[in-house]
């Protein structure tokens, strides 16, 4: 049986709108680091006027069925998807009944994506955070989250965030960690340390205070 909110979300966004979200979400199925892109993905969904339910339907039933196999490929695609190929593949995936909202497709989705479901949960949490902020502050907030994520996961942090250090620290302690700490990887391929991740952010915040 299809949940009412999933059925509504399935066909609500226009094809032009959803194709841009397809391209964005598919980045998170590449064989490369993308956790720093989570806030930007959430911001694009919010800017597009999507509800969390609509974004979830696009992630679960359109993008994941088309590109989930790349997560398990020995030599997975990492440089980026060809736009036309990706759009055609997702349109094709949408035609299969198994990829339409329902209890069975939800089960298949969880089997397919496994650990990558955590990325969606983080996108949804960032969407909720951004939707709760005044519209005029959302770009600044998304940029601050991106800066924190880049430092947390040891990537190039980019430009200095416009939030003052005290607000940035509160954002990190009160909101960021709840969203991003579950994404720290501890598996057979690599082992990250939550302590080391936190130390990088604390060092970056200290550098901002001292500058």
Predicted regions and their residues:
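Small-residue-enriched hydrophobic alpha-helices in membranes
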Residues: 1-15, 42-167, 173-175, 179-207
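Amphipathic alpha-helical packing elements
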Residues: 17-50, 55
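Short intrinsically disordered terminal tails
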Residues: 210-211
């Amino acid at each position: 049986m299809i949940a009412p909110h999933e059925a509504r979300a399935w066909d609500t966004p226009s094809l032009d709108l959803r194709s841009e979200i397809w391209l964005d979400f598919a980045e998170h199925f590449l064989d490369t680091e993308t956790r720093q892109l989570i806030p930007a993905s959430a911001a694009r969904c919010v800017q597009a006027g999507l509800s969390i339910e609509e974004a979830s339907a696009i992630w679960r039933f359109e993008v994941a069925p088309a590109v989930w196999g790349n997560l398990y490929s020995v030599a997975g695609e990492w440089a980026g998807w060809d736009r036309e190929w990706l759009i055609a593949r997702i349109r094709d995936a949408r035609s299969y009944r198994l990829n339409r909202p329902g209890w069975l497709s939800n089960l298949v989705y969880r089997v397919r994506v496994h650990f990558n479901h955590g990325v969606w949960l983080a996108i949804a949490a960032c969407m909720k955070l951004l939707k709760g902020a005044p519209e005029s502050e959302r770009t600044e907030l998304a940029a601050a989250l991106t800066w924190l994520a880049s430092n947390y996961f040891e990537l190039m942090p980019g430009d200095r965030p416009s939030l003052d250090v005290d607000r940035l620290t509160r954002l990190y302690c009160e909101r960021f960690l709840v969203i991003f700490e579950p994404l720290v990887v501890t598996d057979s391929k690599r082992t990250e340390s939550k302590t080391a991740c936190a130390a990088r952010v604390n060092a970056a915040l200290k550098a901002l205070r001292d500058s």
